Amino acid sequence: GKTWSEPRLVTGFDEQTACLVRLPDNTILLVFGHKTDGSGQRFMASFDEGRSWSRTVYQLGQNCQYASTVLLTGNRLVSVSHRIIDGVGIFHARQWSAPKKTAFSDGGFWTPRPAEPLGVARSR
């Protein structure tokens, strides 16, 4: 965190609540919420410190938002997310493992373009 690169667009418009997780092999997973075609959690991977990201995007769960993910022992991950059903807030936890590096490579990689600010939100 001593230095930061220029901001870049990685996931696309209307993706939110991102969480970065570094695996023991130095793979970085970007877990994020999406609202572009429904809502849910997805993730993608970088094997070069975030310079490029997998074109392959994996669906983690649907109809859930605001997930946070942590690494457990044995390369297992747990994602906790929030969902509202009939006006009641419900938390979900999913334990999972990232696919092998070769599974990501099948979809290729892309280099994110610079991010452009969309505006400033203000609250009172």
Annotate the PLM regions:
Residues G1-R124:
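Asp-box/BNR beta-propeller blade signature and adjacent active/binding-site loops
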